[in-house]
Amino acid sequence: MKGQETRGFQSEVKQLLHLMIHSLYSNKEIFLRELISNASDAADKLRFRALSNPDLYEGDGELRVRVSFDKDKRTLTIADNGVGMNRDEVIDHLGTIAKSGTKSFLESMGSDQAKDSQLIGQFGVGFYSAFIVADKVTVRTRAAGDKPENGVFWESAGEGEYTVADITKNDRGTEITLHLREGEDEFLDDWRVRSIISKYSDHIALPVEIEKREEKDGETVISWEKINKAQALWTRNKSEIKDDEYNEFYKHIAHDFTDPLTWSHNRVEGKQEYTSLLYIPSQAPWDLWNRDHKHGLKLYVQRVFIMDDAEQFMPNYLRFVRGLIDSNDLPLNVSREILQDSTVTRNLRSALTKRVLQMLEKLAKDDAEKYQTFWKQFGLVLKEGPAEDHANQEAIAKLLRFASTHTDSSAQTVSLEDYVSRMKEGQEKIYYITADSYAAAKNSPHLELLRKKGIEVLLLSDRIDEWMMNYLTEFDGKAFQSVAKADESIEKLADEVDENAKEAEKALEPFVERVKTLLGDRVKEVRLTHRLTDTPAIVTTDADEMSTQMAKLFAAAGQSVPEVKYIFELNPDHVLVKRTADTKDEAQFKEWVELLLDQALFAERGTLEDPNQFIRRMNQLLVS
């Protein structure tokens, strides 16, 4: 063959092939779904390119996939007359994996076969799934519009290298021949192959045909029988579509192996005409947090495929939504640039966003267990919503889930509606605290008074929480209040101070002044507080001061952080505060005050500027 060369696979391909053969063998029939799905994509791409260049059809506009097998040679062939590939495309698509983050993804794989199977499913194996059942794969392809002599041959045993060469191929499209491994004879059985295609490919709009051979007058007559419905699933009436069909269609468009959690199929007529089929996956994709992660919906215009990953129809905080939109209002020659500035796009985006939020609200109401699965997978992404989408902030807030002092569990199961329904009589605000961990939030001294009063506090420990709460200012007419910030509503919760206590506080005024003088401008203010029960002192910030957690976020992002000026609050009923107030020796007094301040700062920030000094002070006072 002309131009023949042997090339090595990209290292990630070798690793993926090894993992796939071992992890997916128990569900090996999916190779046929993957290859037919790829053929369907190739047909979609040809239709789209032919909109501007009809000659690409080469006189054959009847697109299809054909499946045949040869029992003597033990081969199974899947052929399409779609867009095809040239030599460079063959090398790019079949010799490398052009996905950022692939290496780190593969390194995360372990020895847990079930887990690896799910992870590879998220990754999307496509063409390489052929090697699950084949010990050699041969590809013959030609790009639509190219000359017959520009065909390409590709072959590999999947062990580290592949051969590529130039061939003559009269018909456009791609033909993939699987040389089956020993023991895979089930895929040479007509009934078995038919049942797999019916199971996985009924929803594909492209006809899938299987070869029929009949003996007539001593000759073998070959014909092709269509075995799928070949009608785009989203164009069918909802009442006619089974759940299994919706599930399989999801796996086709999302290249996922697991069923979705829920979906919404809608046809809208009137001012705008479109059909949408939107899915919520049951698992987050492996690269959800990758900056280059592609997301968005498949876009069809009047049932003609236009593009994948049309991100213009979903806000970023809903980037996990998969599915498609088929619009009658956009032009067939629409581009990403036109979509960006289109009024139609903006209207569709608004309608689809509301549709997804309604779908999630229904899921939360109808199936709390499934909604918890969703929250564990995508809750962090949804928390971006209040900052990004002010118009739908209340709807997003209803979907948020938190840990709280009411459940005494780190599981984020409490909704804001739950919280409001449990608010005490006269309680005006929704109280929360942000911290580095659930344990730090749960054990914060800021909670002592509220616990004593039986008032619920939301415990927020995700890194995004502090940022989110800057935008989520109220819910159901109730303002949010951080318990780590100074606030009159919290002080009002303290018991009425009796006359004796007032006298005792008055007697401590010189002590407070003494502490102020000692600490100077290191703190914003020193004062007594009744919000503590077991802790001698805390630090708080003013309402307009940057919070500790926000300062940490800035620092983690490498940004300069303004110094946070804390209010130093002392518990007049605590024995350590009383002992410090009674200390006459100035050096000893300084040690006690510094220790109390360091304790308060450590509880608030989790770190100290000079931990060794704190330990020295602690040890010295323990033995004094």
From Swiss-Prot:
The keyword Zinc-finger does not apply. Residues 1-336 are annotated as: A. It comes from the Bacteria. SUPFAM superfamilies: ATPase domain of HSP90 chaperone/DNA topoisomerase II/histidine kinase, HSP90 C-terminal domain, Ribosomal protein S5 domain 2-like. Its main location: cytoplasm. It is found in: Cytoplasm. Residues 553-624 are annotated as: C. GO terms for cellular component: cytoplasm. One of its GO terms (molecular function) is ATP-dependent protein folding chaperone. Transmembrane segments: none annotated. CDD domains: HATPase_Hsp90-like. Residues 337-552 are annotated as: B. Keywords: ATP-binding, Chaperone, Cytoplasm, Nucleotide-binding, Stress response. Disulfide bonds: none annotated. Gene3D superfamilies: 3.30.230.80, 3.40.50.11260, Heat shock protein 90, C-terminal domain (1.20.120.790), Histidine kinase-like ATPase, C-terminal domain (3.30.565.10). Homodimer. Belongs to the heat shock protein 90 family. Molecular chaperone. Has ATPase activity. This is Chaperone protein HtpG. It comes from Salmonella typhi. The lineage of its organism: Bacteria, Pseudomonadati, Pseudomonadota, Gammaproteobacteria, Enterobacterales.
